[in-house]
Amino acid sequence: MIQYLLFATFFGLLLLGIHRKVIARIQRRPGPPIWQEILHMFKFSFKSTWVPRTASDTLFVGVVLIAIGIWTAALFVVLAGGSLLIIFGIYMLHKIVEHGFGLSSGSPYGKFGGVRSVISAASEIPLFVSVAAIALFTKSLSISDIISYQETSGPLILAIPLSAVAMYIVIVSKMPYGPFSIVEGKELVSGYKTEHFGVWRAGLEICNGLKTYVLLMTFILVFFGGVPFGVMLLLMILIIVTLSFVCALTPMLSPFDSVTVQTLITGVMVVYVAILWWWWI
């Protein structure tokens, strides 16, 4: 399992590198090599590490370990075919951790990034209303049961495409350089992670790699079913390329516009699930 954890981390970082490369090529720039995020992780691992004088030492260090821990747990939950509710609970916990990152440093940039993380959560989390549609069809929120259902009834992406779109938007909101990346806006330098440097930033890179891998793996298992491992990796690459196109071709929204757009999408999803429920009964 340790080997798979390492693989998930490095492949997730490779996916983020592909993401940056595709965005650069769309914008007619050469861009960094696709292994750039992996190099970043190693680079920060050997740089000087410190805790700012204005920071809360315990919180400043603890949030990095918590961030890695919760996404490691999420990976094992997915591999074990556990409940989607646990994955979504970890996602919500990650928003709290992001807020902790911002508060821990004492930096105004970090604080604003942490506040924006809470603002974004208000609109992202309701998108999980899409799980209601999944439960209507599969009668379960267990990933293993959802995979079993698709073996006999076909991929859920064909049965409930709007739920897949809602989950896709959740993933878009966690991708760097995307329209909903308000927690990392240029006016905030690096947002909530501005003051985390050295080994702490390397820990954040590990967290980002795991998070990317887990979210894409969950999306594929829930909407495409239990595909072979090689096919799953190929699908991850294809999905990350589509995400890169979305991020490259759409402007970063303001916090207000980001919440407004995602709230409207949530409203559409509520109506969609209500229609499915009425039709199903």
List each model region and its residues.
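Alpha-helical transmembrane segments of multi-pass membrane proteins predominantly involved
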Residues: 1-281
